[in-house]
């Protein structure tokens, strides 16, 4: 998709993770005239814009009636900004962060490899305010992909693997007795078209459909 828009891709080894991509970006900025690095893991404008826009939209659409927010942590900007706004409106709102179970850095564990692109950077981003988070929920690769596929088949939502992880976490929260009949807000940040060539969708067995099957 990026190449279709004329972009030149500079790929880094998968084993280097996000840190490898950040390091290459810094090297490119140093060598390319007039280059600018957004630094989304460090730029305070990241959580600020979510506090001013995303969170306000959530509050207005819900008419102030929500009990919990569940979101994956990539840069940490979305969950930090939204949590700050929502907790100012209602301190009783609980905020749940989602991270890969094989890279439980937010839970105090060690970074590791995983297949949930978009979250689990392997370090705690500078823009992430852990004081806003009430609980961290760990989701494994299979859970994220399974729920992501179900979202497409059962709900008509073609979303990415990090969205699958967020909904998987929301289901766990919703199954807790204290959240029965409560309103949970889940942020789905990824669209599925970016994942059609990944294991998440290529593992779906092809099933031929007859033309008159739905007539």
Please provide the spans of the model-predicted regions:
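Alpha-helix C-terminal capping segments
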Residues: 3-4, 81-90, 168-178
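Residues at the starts of beta-strands that form the adenosine-phosphate
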Residues: 8, 92-94, 183
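Short beta-strand segments
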Residues: 39-40, 72-74, 97-99, 185-190
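Phosphate-binding loop/pocket of nucleotide- and phosphate-handling active sites
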Residues: 168-215
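Ser/Thr-glycine-rich phosphate-binding loops at phosphate-binding pockets of nucleotides
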Residues: 71-79, 162-166, 184
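Active-site-adjacent helical/loop segments in soluble small-molecule enzymes
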Residues: 131-180
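Glycine-rich ThDP/TPP pyrophosphate-binding loop and its adjacent helix/strand module
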Residues: 49-93
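Small/polar-residue-rich loop-to-helix segments that shape phosphate-bearing ligand pockets
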Residues: 1-68, 98-152
